């Protein structure tokens, strides 16, 4: 029974927690030194990825604690605490005050610098100017109508059953589907389950998860398996080949979706590594009233991998600058070739 309750808790977090939501606890003290130590200790006891990121948190303390100064004003203290948090290199980590919100710019710039898509080429030569827009998806058929191309740039808005049914019906005569999630920075993790609802679901394992459950670095709950549904949204599950396109800007909920594709024989990932972000954030309140959040869970894929730093594609394809200059997206072309080769 305990297993079931914790599993439901983990899936409940996925279903109802967006990538921007934090949960609060209660403050206990006041001055800058206490605030700094409180934050450092919370991360020390609850952060989930010291090992996979190779972070020595004690060393981080030795670097930043001496920077505390008597009479520090709020802005300087905020900047110090934010700099300490940014050593986690985690896009799910923030410090929030009434005058600023910290964010990990290194994660953002990595997404932008290593993007594996030219949106102008996609718009002009694949979606084309007569594309359709439905429930957040931009879509059209390519390769003489043989391949459905669906572009989804964010998971921030809820995807509903009607949208998915419409798309599957519209492209029912295509030989397969490209789902382009490049530079999709995430959003509602509940969209993962919704998107998977069109496929062949029979309660198969999607991934395993565990929560940081104690103060020790290795204190995690036992691994619990998150399962697919046992029903399908459609009258007949979508079993045609599906190519999911990802890159370093595919983060958080998009990485969760990418991990889940391992459970489906008809889906392959194309492109570059995702941006990771497979820990669900939790947070609380500091002694001075500021709030914080950071990742407290970790996710293990069906193949045993912990892909917090990026989900690997099944077929790695990087944009060819020469082809891009000619208006050709070789990631889309490779995916389309694979789909047509399966028919």
What spans do the regions from the language model cover?
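C-terminal "post-core" interaction segments
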Residues: 20-37, 75, 176, 185-343
